[in-house]
Amino acid sequence: MRYRYIFWDFNGTIIDDVRNSLGCVNDLLDRKNRPHITLDDYYNYVETPIIGFYRHILPPEEINFDEISKAFHEDYGKRIVNTRLADGAYELMHSLKEQGVHQYIVTSNHIDEVTDLVKRFGIYDCVEKILGADNTLSESKTQRAKELFDSLNINRNDAVFIGDTLHDLETANTLGIDYILVEYGHQGKKLLRSFGAYTVADLKGVEKILYDERRVDFHTHSTRSDGTMTPAELVQHAKNVGLSAFALTDHDSVDGIEEAQNEAEKIGVEFIPGIEFSAAEDTEIHIIGLYIDPRNEKLLKTINKLKGSRKRRMEDICRKLRSLGFEITHDEALLIGGGHFVGRAHIAKLIVQKGYCNTVQECFDKYIGLGKPAYSEKNELTATEAVESIRAAGGLAFLAHPHQTKYNLNQLEELLLKLKAVGLNGLEGYYSEYTPEHIADYRLLAQKLKLAFSGGSDFHGAMKPHIAMGTGKGNLNIPYYVLDNIKDIKSSQNS
């Protein structure tokens, strides 16, 4: 079992009441001599707070929300006898209880109404707490969920929110936990997926994810950039640490992909060819490419352009370090990189070897990090060019570790909108060094801009010994459904 704590939405998730709600809405429209809406209309219009839904179907002068809400709940109460549990809900919730999984219901509906239904359907003993509204307004569900989550003091990797709407996705993102959205609820598959969300058809799909302990990592490096494992060693390490799939995303290089692909086929690890482009706006930007064609002409042209730029930049860093009194040469750093590649991490390792600093991180913090005295700007590739090169190679493009830029959330949103216009698919929603605030901020931003998210450890081997492949600092656990979502996006992109 992947999760130990499950937060359930109620309406449209545990109970299948969409047609009841649609009937109530059309009864209201009858009373106002307005045409009925269809189920597709309902899927497209439902939102939270619910008053937004009525703005889609009624003119402003006919919206008296207190009156509408009272009438809806009276009509819904009459239809309660027709409400039923979603297929498989009883069996799944009881099975989870038997396995010691903690289950909670968080709903926008009145708590008494929900409690009565939960008892009626025989699942009351499965849940430890029901959190609902104490009036008829559909609001504050997310806040109730957050207060409960914070009070439990649990690991985010152990929790999941199961729901059926974008509001449920927002709640999960606010908590910084995984989500599962069902397609039979109050918002359809088309709308949910347009926001980059992954959906399943029914509770059998939910159960499959709950029991699927496969893990993935979309951000790793080999000796073909600044990692310390060869591509083949990296594949073997992925298998050893229990990953089902991973991406090799060397900096500005595809040189290790063929070796990694061959090894992955031999030992049965699912491999994703990737790259991490280093680019510049008014700050340093990294763009991850997944499922790229490493032979693509435009991609290779961009990489060749960067090779010359990288060498000039590393030589400039070495010159600046020498001006600070360090005896450092580019050729020495190249030896550290195994003769393939020189990055700042290799220079930092050389500095440590020569006794100028105690750790690689100290080198970055004092000398070669952004804004430090030996830092050298990148100016050969824009983020737009990076995204365009990835997309030209048939890949998907994701903004890597946005917290490492100097952007605040508003500036980050502007960047993402700009890059989305040229093909950006998403950003990293999982990362080894994210705080809980980072997780919530970036996932909510992805949802707002209809972007998907990837994620990864940023594993470098001994170059970053505190970062483990697949688990980061012990805080990373990327479920396989994230890869399923990326595959679906890839398939849609190709069709």
Label every PLM stretch briefly.
Residues 1-44, 58, 247:
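Active-site neighborhood of HAD-like aspartate-dependent phosphohydrolases
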Residues 2-5, 141-169:
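Conserved Lys-Pro-Asp/Glu-containing loop-to-beta segment of HAD-superfamily phosphomonoesterases
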Residues 55-94, 101, 364-378:
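Metal-dependent phosphoesterase signature
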Residues 78-105, 111, 115, 142, ...:
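Short, acidic loop-to-helix structural element flanking the phosphoryl-transfer center
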Residues 89-119, 131-133, 247-249, 396-403:
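Substrate-recognition element of Asp-dependent hydrolases with the DxDx(T/V) motif
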Residues 160-200:
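Acidic, Mg2+-coordinating phosphoryl-transfer loop and its flanking beta/alpha structural elements
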Residues 211-284, 368-369, 381, 387-388, ...:
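An N-terminally biased module of ancient metal coordination in phosphate/nucleic-acid-related enzymes
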Residues 263-417, 476-485, 489-493:
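Extended substrate/RNA-proximal surfaces in nucleic-acid metabolism proteins
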